């Protein structure tokens, strides 16, 4: 209930500010379909579905004690949707996500590093971590290495974004790949249609894909 109430405050603040805007706009990498503005379109990844796929991948590899590092669900819409995806995957596999497996972090190396250390200090059994961004995944991996542990031998990691960083880190990071070029192209096309053709707002979800590389280990129970 607390989270839902804070979401309403966040959305109400955005609505109050955007209600003063009277020109066509496109919200990029975030959803605007529930905001109800005729002049506000959106193009984004389905963050909830993508996070659910990432978590399902870990469950399919035998992991059950999966931690989450990410932004504050009460302050960020993408973070809230990715948190929901995590919870949905847990429920699908007959489990309930426990809050002590969640560590909040900003989308930075340093913040995720500290968040991973916080999880390790809680001394809870963790075999895998889903990080809401590739930058977070790298920060978490550095904390794991500094604690004398290994990825994926001791703890598996899945990231989100599909940046080049995930391909050039060692080990390469399993990640959700967002199609940024398509998101950008569609955003511009929709904006021009709204301006030149006076078209009403549309809300599109661009397909995503899970990129399977090196940072996840299948447990023996699989």
What are these model-predicted stretches?
Residues 1-9:
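Single conserved hydrophobic/aromatic residue that forms the stacking wall/gate
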Residues 9, 15, 19-222:
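Bacterial carbohydrate/catabolite-sensing allosteric modules
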